[in-house]
Regions:
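N-terminal non-catalytic cap/leader segment that marks the start of a structured domain
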Residues: 1-77, 83, 148
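Glycine-enriched loop-and-adjacent helix/strand subsegments that border the catalytic/binding cleft
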Residues: 51-151
Length: 151
């Protein structure tokens, strides 16, 4: 079964009694896998995974491609972000003191659930563990001088 099959399952990862725990949602409570319940408003969230790498598709919106005056892309290009870029729900975002242009974009993150290499496009869904909302934030002060990076 892949992520597109079966019932929708919303899981959240929290820090509970000093340990990472997976939960499901039941109203205003979160239910741990062992059945214990915690009040959602009182939990500390963790990111939905512990990534080993973060790969981002570059210029995935036509408006961005036009903004950067990039040619039509035959295949997508990508860039990497450090794993320290991952934050959790309700996490703090620190804006550098000298940052004038903080850019943010809503994204959909695909969480890859197992090692994946040379996978045929039609088999991709078998490797995706789920999806999460993501906020791609970047300090754009160096955009003109580092146009190749754009991160």
């Amino acid at each position: 079964m892949n992520v597109l099959e079966g019932e929708r399952l919303e899981q959240r990862r929290i820090l509970h009694e000093g340990r990472p725990e997976w939960t499901t949602v039941d109203g205003e409570e979160l239910v741990l896998m062992d059945g214990r319940r915690v009040v959602e408003a009182e939990v500390n969230y963790l990111p939905p995974c512990n990534p080993t790498k973060i790969l981002c598709i570059h210029l995935n919106f036509e408006s961005r491609r036009i903004e950067f005056r990039a040619p039509d892309l035959v295949t997508p290009t990508y860039f990497q972000k450090p794993i320290t870029a991952v934050n959790a729900h309700r996490g703090m975002l620190n804006r550098p003191d000298n940052c004038q242009y903080l850019n943010y974009e809503g994204e959909v993150a695909a969480i890859i659930g197992r090692p994946m290499k040379n996978v045929a496009p039609e088999d991709t869904w078998n490797y995706i563990a789920g999806f999460a909302p993501a906020n791609d934030v970047g300090a754009q002060d160096f955009r003109e001088t580092d146009a190749g990076g754009m991160t």
